Amino acid sequence: MSDIKKVVLAYSGGLDTSVIVRWLQDTYNCEVVTFTADIGQGEEVEPARAKAEALGVKEIYIEDLREEFVRDYVFPMFRANTIYEGEYLLGTSIARPLIAKRLIDIANETGADAISHGATGKGNDQVRFELGAYALKPGVKVIAPWREWDLNSREKLLKYCEERNIPVEMKKGKSPYSMDANLLHISYEGINLEDPWAEAEEDMWRWSVSPEAAPDKPTYVELTYRKGDIVAVDGQEMKPHVVLETLNKLAGENGIGRLDIVENRYVGMKSRGCYETPGGTIMLRAHRAIESITLDREVAHLKDSLMPRYAEVIYNGYWWSPEREALQALIDQTQNYVNGTVRLKLYKGNVDVVGRKSDDSLFDEKIATFEEDQGAYDQKDAEGFIKLNALRLRIAAGKGRKL
């Protein structure tokens, strides 16, 4: 263990990572550099500085990454209309590549020979952090304390703090759930949620009112798109992270974005989790709406066929992989004409698309109309089209093939 001289730790300032700081110092006799990222988790990150200083940390990195997170990770993901297993908007998964990147950047800047994280040995995050780290710095050493130590309960962690005089802040009103938050979503796991039959308690949800308690009057919002990304809300241009903050507020007020699922983790187990992704729920509906009038049919269908694979790549932690980059290049190319405006109605947990328009629209009213089209579409042409497409079916039926 003496070959480890300096470690960069993904540090939240909470119980687990505060214990990890001291554990790394004691176990590896190394210097610890802490890195705390503000990706919109809704908590002050600056107090992490004082906590790290109290633990003897000399190099402390605290960074506001909200704009980079939404611009370079969330928006590219939403260009693909990405959902995992038909429901999950990948709020936790998409935050890990940026954190892994900054851990490696800081390791390079400080001359550290290892990185460390507080992900457990049961979850997906250990995979996501470490796959990203190895892709960006192949020879880096990764220390995952939860896979090494025997501090496998909150009681043992608190006892460790008491024995070593590590200050622990016990917040009043702190949720008993295991939670993870960023600008895209907040997740809840543990306690009664470990029973897939138990309904989540109403006071668990932090970002949204219940649909029943949402206003009786709908809220309308218009989103402007440029090359597949939202650039304005109700005509007001905004930076990407401000767009998401704005949509989170609007959606949360209208009871939008709650999800309760059992998902298949990459490590092999099934896990029940509850998620609030208010702004992301709006973004998914709106993006599909603007694509519906601007994308060629076959391009849209190709994108839809690739989306589950793209979602799986991100969920499993392969953001920094050649397959993700190849898929991203194709997805981004499809967005060149995804420009225009979508109007949505938000009402008691529902997001309804009520209008869409674009200068790049492929919707031709003269052809699509049920009224007189002045010869724009000759209905007689349909007969040959149908006969050609039925040819294989007619041949098979003529040979006596049974379906």
Curated annotation (Swiss-Prot):
InterPro entries: Arginosuc_syn_C (IPR048268), Arginosuc_syn_N (IPR048267), Arginosuc_synth (IPR001518), Arginosuc_synth_CS (IPR018223), Arginosuc_synth_type_1_subfam (IPR023434), AS_cat/multimer_dom_body (IPR024074), Rossmann-like_a/b/a_fold (IPR014729)
Tree of life domain: Bacteria
Main location: cytoplasm
Gene3D superfamilies found in the cross-reference section: Argininosuccinate synthetase, chain A, domain 2, HUPs, Single helix bin
A biological-process GO annotation: urea cycle
Signal sequence interval, chain numbering: none
Catalytic activity reported: L-citrulline + L-aspartate + ATP = 2-(N(omega)-L-arginino)succinate + AMP + diphosphate + H(+)
Pathway terms, separated by semicolons: Amino-acid biosynthesis; L-arginine biosynthesis; L-arginine from L-ornithine and carbamoyl phosphate: step 2/3
SS bond partners: none
Pfam families tied to this protein: Arginosuc_syn_C, Arginosuc_synth
One cellular-component annotation, GO: cytoplasm
Residues annotated to bind ATP: 10-18, 37, 118
The EC number(s) this enzyme carries: 6.3.4.5
UniProt binding sites for L-aspartate: 120, 124-125
Compartments reported by the entry: Cytoplasm
Protein family (similarity comment): Belongs to the argininosuccinate synthase family. Type 1 subfamily.
HAMAP family xrefs: Arg_succ_synth_type1
The protein's name: Argininosuccinate synthase
Species whose genome carries this gene: Marinobacter nauticus (strain ATCC 700491 / DSM 11845 / VT8) (Marinobacter aquaeolei)
Gene responsible for this protein: argG
